[in-house]
UniProtKB/Swiss-Prot annotation:
A GO term for molecular function: hydrolase activity, hydrolyzing O-glycosyl compounds
Pathway this chain belongs to: Glycan biosynthesis; glycogen biosynthesis
Xref: CDD domains: AmyAc_Glg_BE (cd11322), E_set_GBE_prok_N (cd02855)
The protein, known as: 1,4-alpha-glucan branching enzyme GlgB
Amino acid sequence: MAGVSASDIKAHLFHEGRLYESYRFFGAHQTEQDGRQGFRFCVWAPHAKEVRIAGTFNGWSGVLHRMEKRHQEGIWELFIPGIGEGELYKYEMITAANETKLKADPYAFFSEVRPKTASVTYQLAGYQWGDRKWQKKKQQKAVYEKPISIYELHIGSWKKKADGRFFTYRELSETVIPYVKEHGFTHIELMPLTEHPFDRSWGYQTTGYYSPTSRYGEPHDLMYFIDQCHQHEIGVIMDWVSGHFCKDDHGLYLFDGMPLYEYKHEHDRENWEWGTANFDLGKREVHSFLISNALYWIEMYHIDGFRVDAVANLLYWPNRPQPEANGFAIEFIQTLNEQVFAKDPHFLMIAEDSTDWPLVTHPTYEGGLGFNYKWNMGWMNDVLTYMEASPEQRKHLHHLVSFSLMYAYSENYILPFSHDEVVYRKKSLLHKMPGDYWQKFAQYRLLISYFMMHPGKKLLFMGGEFAQFDEWKDEEELDWFLDDFDMHRKARMFTKEALHLYKKSRILYENDHRQQGFEWIDVNNAEQSIVSFIRYGKQPGEALIIVCNFTPSVYHEYRVGVPFQTEYIEVLNSDDAKYGGSHQINPKRLQARKGVLHGKPYSISMTVPPLGAAVFRAVKKRGAKKG
């Protein structure tokens, strides 16, 4: 169209909510104009009377660099020649009330180290990625049929230097990656890395959505960390907060003197619980900002997945006496997921949703929200409630370990033992377990066993792998000294071996989302607090038999029904002495005997360990009979 510039087209798409690479248009970009190198700045501030750029290059005097209002809807631009990377800057907003506000760039690629708040000019291009093999392998199989075991990591408190300083992204790559690889995790989930002013918000109160926090280094350092993860066959998931943002003066809040990124009306805008502001998802420009942000992390940082935080906060209007669905947010979520999967069909879009909203992990064309995974908060709450009860009381709570299978296939689930469950006096997983010292560890191993054998992908927060006794202390490193204690060291060995068993056992992940992949053997043995079930593989004769005993009693010659007339080998027993148990194991192969039991045509007799789990693999034999 004659007279319409590329800039005009991008502005039009931005206002329609369809500029999905808005980070290439807005922000600070190194470029050349009229033969001179410099940076082009662009910002959306429709309510401002004037916008200037103040920074180290002009003595923080914005009057020297007044931006031009290029578009009627409030997009301001300016090219400043002669400046390079590493310059500090802010937008100097002259509001309609003639107030002056200094604001960080919403699209800044880099920021000053807190408590300082300026944006930093930075050239993202130039990092040489070495993860082509990972990217190719990722496309070869649907995520649903892959093992997914996630190590949830808070970079600032995994380990700290002797003087209390943080390790950098690059430094952590030398320790975290081998550790995660050794233990058999398939993914690392990083708690939010977007820039945030307050350490103890853990990153959930963001000011810089396009800026990885400078606490741990520069953007290229984070790229290096992710690249190294990929080269060691570890995927990287990032916590992503799209519902609300930090209200600090330099951030998005009242950006140009008026509500811009947030809702206009106070009862919609204010998130009283967290002290933040809710994004106005009715604004198309906010759609462009957030969807572009998701695609930015995929394109520029090769992120493999998002755990989308606080989806319930998106789905329902805040501050209402009764739950009221937010149609703007539903449309936003559906569009977000459609655009992400158009970019990468094998991406992980994980909803952290505590509600019973239907079809969360169903495609948008079926009326679903379009995620491909959802945290199973119901399972987590039920199982932890059950495990915190004394063994004597568990027979009265038996439904808590069985109810999850009533809905396990209604969505695609991840089973989460996350940071939320081991903080704010909730106690660590180990400390939640009742009983004496030995019993706590036995029940920890039993909990991990049930977690690993139950349908659903897995997530475990750091420190859970070695049964840290204290809950998470976000200003300190993990209690690594516990590895000097025998029971903690053995707990870590058990978790590691359970994770590796999961990773190498197709039975435990290929049929995760198919009802034919699971069958109860005996779900009704409340009196003894024992559950037994089968995990089936895709191939004929593939099966694991799992028996979990939630009391301290030992049962010898305990018989359960099995589907195949073959031998069964114990592949994991949480009571093995090498894990700190009492060694009530089944060292010999168990031969199936003909005779109906639990609705199965054959049965095996075993020793059931106290406060423990035993897992048996059916030996595939040519001509083995199935009932």
